[in-house]
Amino acid sequence: IYVMDEANVETCGADAELSNNELWLFAQMERVAGMVKRDKNHPSIIFWSLGNESGVGANNAARASWVKDYDPTRLVHFEAYMHNGGSRQYGYGIDFMKTNRPAVNPPEPPAVDVVSTMYPSVEGIIKLATQEGETRPVLMCEYAHAKGNALGNHQEYWNAVKKYPRLIGGYIWDWVDQSVIRKDSVTGKEYFSSLNGTNGLVFADRKIKPAINECK
């Protein structure tokens, strides 16, 4: 199995406020460096991720630089660099698939080795894969949200992946339902309790769902 090891750095909802604040640099660097030092000898890890949904800022560039210096053998990934590097906003309000500007920002820092995006349309990943002047691989770091009766158009994504060489696939959100075992107060029967967490390819007890057959 190929693994992208991702640091425990996320500021979802705060945009890039922490990534542009030098007071948070040490804490963010500590998490990234700790991950790389801990896992560097695992052969299944083929690239590092600086974190998830934490905006663009100087702290990210510093962390990417450290990782590349410490381990030049692996790629560095960070999805937030898809967004405007000159803006403190994370960029979810901009539907770049419906604009005339390049899918990847021209001023994007050369800190990352992978073009990455979340929940794109099929047309969106084709646009990324065919952008003139761009040669890096394209990854869907989150896609095909497997909630309920999902993955209905999964084949369309993989038709594109197989057609365009720069598309390298993606990570489905997510693998297993997020649940805890509870007992019914009346019958005493155990059941899996989940509040809006039934978004796995398999149930909490690892029994398969139809969605995983679609993946196969």
Place the predicted regions along the sequence by residue.
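Extended substrate-binding grooves/exosites of carbohydrate-active enzymes
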Residues: 1-216
